[in-house]
Amino acid sequence: MAENDGETIVPDEQCNLTASTPMKSSGLEQVESPKERKTSMVECDDEGNPSSGTPDESPKQLTPHSIPPRRRRSPRRPEVSASRLPLKVLNQIFQYLPLKDLRSAMLTCHSWNNALSMEDSDIWQYLLGKKLPEAAVSDPFLLAELGSAKKKLRAWYFAWNTSDISRNNYIRTNGFTVHRQPVAQSTDGVRGKRGISKGVHAFDITWDGPLGTVAVVGIATKHAALHCVGYVALLGSDDQSWGWNLVDNVLMHNGAQLGVYPKMNNPPKYEVGDKIRLIIDCDTHVAYFERNSEFLGIAFNHIPPLRLYPAVCAVYGNTEVTMVYVGSPQMG
Amino acid sequence: MSAEAVAAAPIAEEATPVVYYSIESNDRVVLKISEQAIKQSATLSNSITNLGYSAENAESMVPIPIEKVNGKTLKLVVEWCEHHKADPVPEAYPSGNTVLPVWDRKFVDIEHDALTDLVNASNFLEVMTLLTYCCKFIAGLAKGMSPEEMRVFFCIPTDEEDEKAERFGKEKTEASATSADTTA
C-alpha cells in the first residue's frame, strides 16, 4: 500500500508541474499559449495511462483546456486534423472542387500538396475525363508526349480558343486542331486560350495540311487581328504580333521582315507534319523555335512585357494546324 | 383449418424478430446494429461473415471490436446505417455527380472534429455512401476559400506553428525529465 501511494504521488506532481509551466510561458508569449495547452493535453494523456487512479482525474483536467484553443482558432488535436486524412479520402473531397480551389488546396499544407502533386492520381484522371473531349483522349498520338493526366489537362487549358478565332476557322472536336475552311481571298488566324507573361513556356505546333502561299506560326497579343482580306502574312504585320512564315522562312514583326530563319544559307523548307516547338521566355523577353527537337536560334528578342498568346494564320483551304502546350521545355 | 393455422403462425413468428449484432468501440461503448443496416458497411459485413456470426448466435456472441473508432463517432455511423438500411449498397464509389439529400446534409453538418472523425470512421468501415456525402459536404465548405482560409477553417497548422509546437514539446519533455531527476 505504501508503495502504491508512492507511485500515485509522482504522476500528480508531474501533472502539477506540467500545469504550472504553461502559466509561466504564457506570461512571456501569449501567441504560444494555445499550443502549450495542446502539448500539455498530450502529456497528461501519456502520464495518465500507466496509473489506474489518474484516468478519473485526467478527463476533468482536459475539459477546461479544450475550450480556449477552439475560440482562438489555433491548431488543435493534430491526430484528427483535416491535413492528415487518408489519400483516398482527400481524392474524394478534391474531386468535387473546381480547379481554382484545387490550387488553394495545394497551398494549404504539405500533405494536401503531396496528394495533388501525384500527376496521375484519381483526381486528375477524373478531371481529365470530365474536361477533355473524347476525340482527344482516344487519339494515341495527339498528347503522347505528355506523360501525366495533369499535364494533359493543362494542355487543354492552353489549346486553341474556340471564341478567339477567325470566322473561317473552326476547332475540330479534339479541341487541339484548327481547320481552315476553303474561303477565297482570306487570311484566317487563331489564338490560344491562355496567354503567358512570366516564365518559360513551350508549345508544340504541327502543320497537318499543306502550307499554301502563307503559313505563319508565332505569337500575338490580345489585340492582334486574326482576319484580313487577301493572302497576307497577317501574323507579324503589326506591332501586336510576331510571326515566322514557314513558306519562305521569313521572320516578321511590325510589318518588317527580320530576315530568314534559321539564319543560314538556304534554310530547309518545312515538311508537312514536322513538329515545331515555339518557346517563349518571358523573363529574358525572347522567343525561338525548335524543329524536331533541334534548336534553330533566337527568332525574336526585346519582346515587350505583354501577355502573349500562341497563334497561327493560314490561307490554304482545308489545311489544319495542331497546337499542344508542353509547359517548361527541358533545357539541354 | 387447424393445420393451416399452425403453418401460418411459424411464418409470422419468423418475420417478426429483427437480428441485431453488437459492436464495441475503442472506448468500450457497445452498440447494436441490425442485420439489414450492417450491409451498408463492407468492413462490418465481412467481419460478420468471416468470424462466423449468424442470426442464430448473434445474441450470445461477444461484441465485434472496432479498434479505430470511438463511441461517439460509431454511434453516428450506426444511426446513419439504420436510416439507410433499405438503400442499395453501391459497388464502387459514386462519381462526381452525387447529390446530397436533405437528411444527410443535416446529418453531416456537425463540428469539424466530429466530422473529421466521421470521415475517418466511414472510410475505415467502408460505408461508401456516407463517406461520399461527407466528402461532398467538406468540398462544399472549402469551395471558394483561399489557402489561409482553408487552414483556419480546417484547423491545419502552418509550418511555423508546427515548428513552435515541436520546440515547445521538446522543452516540456526536458522539464519533465528534470523534475523526475529532482524527485528521484
From Swiss-Prot, chain A:
Compartments where found = Synapse
Q: Where are the coiled-coil regions? A: none
- Annotated B30.2/SPRY domain residues: 138-330
Pfam families per record = F-box, SPRY
Q: What does the entry give for GO biological process? A: dauer larval development; determination of adult lifespan; negative regulation of apoptotic process; negative regulation of axon extension; negative regulation of axon regeneration; negative regulation of DNA damage response, signal transduction by p53 class mediator; negative regulation of gene expression; positive regulation of neuromuscular synaptic transmission
Q: Which InterPro entries match?
A: B30.2/SPRY, B30.2/SPRY_sf, ConA-like_dom_sf, F-box-like_dom_sf, F-box_dom, FBXO45-Fsn/SPSB_families, SPRY_dom, SPRY_FBXO45
Going by the UniProt record, its keywords in alphabetical order are: Synapse, Ubl conjugation pathway
Query: Is S-adenosyl-L-methionine found in the keyword set?
Result: no
Q: Name one GO molecular function term.
A: protease binding
* Gene null: resulting phenotype: Synaptic defects that include both overdevelopment and underdevelopment of presynaptic and postsynaptic termini. Abnormal morphology of cholinergic and GABAergic neuromuscular junctions (NMJs) characterized by uneven distribution of presynaptic markers snb-1 and unc-17 and post-synaptic markers GABA receptor unc-49 and AChR unc-38. Also, formation of abnormally large and small synapses. Frequency of spontaneous miniature synaptic release (mPSC) from cholinergic and GABAergic NMJs is reduced.
Q: Where is the composition biased (Polar residues)?
A: 15-28, 49-64
- Superkingdom of this entry's organism? Eukaryota
**Ranges of residues in domain F-box:** 79-127
Cellular component (GO) terms are: neuromuscular junction; neuron projection; presynapse; SCF ubiquitin ligase complex; synapse
Region entry Disordered: which residue ranges? Answer: 1-82
Q: Which pathway is this protein assigned to?
A: Protein modification; protein ubiquitination
Tissue expression, as annotated, is: Expressed in GABAergic neuromuscular junctions (NMJs).
Q: Which CDD domains match?
A: F-box_FBXO33, SPRY_Fbox
Assembly state and interactors? Component of an SCF (SKP1-CUL1-F-box protein) E3 ubiquitin ligase complex composed of cul-1, fsn-1, rpm-1 and skr-1. Interacts (via SPRY domain) with scd-2 (via cytoplasmic domain). Interacts (via SPRY domain) with convertase egl-3 (via C-terminus).
The family database entries (PANTHER family) matched by this protein are listed as:
F-BOX_SPRY DOMAIN-CONTAINING PROTEIN 1, SPRY DOMAIN CONTAINING SOCS BOX PROTEIN
Stated role: Component of a SCF (SKP1-CUL1-F-box protein) E3 ubiquitin ligase complex which is required for the restriction and/or maturation of synapses in GABAergic neuromuscular junction (NMJ) presynaptic neurons. Promotes NRJ synapse development and synaptic transmission by negatively regulating the daf-2/InsR pathway in muscles. By targeting convertase egl-3 for degradation, negatively modulates insulin-like protein ins-4 and ins-6 processing. May stabilize synapse formation by promoting the down-regulation of scd-2. Regulates axon termination in PLM and ALM neurons.
| Protein family (similarity comment) | Belongs to the FBXO45/Fsn family.
Its recorded name reads F-box/SPRY domain-containing protein 1
Lineage, broadest ranks? Eukaryota, Metazoa, Ecdysozoa, Nematoda, Chromadorea
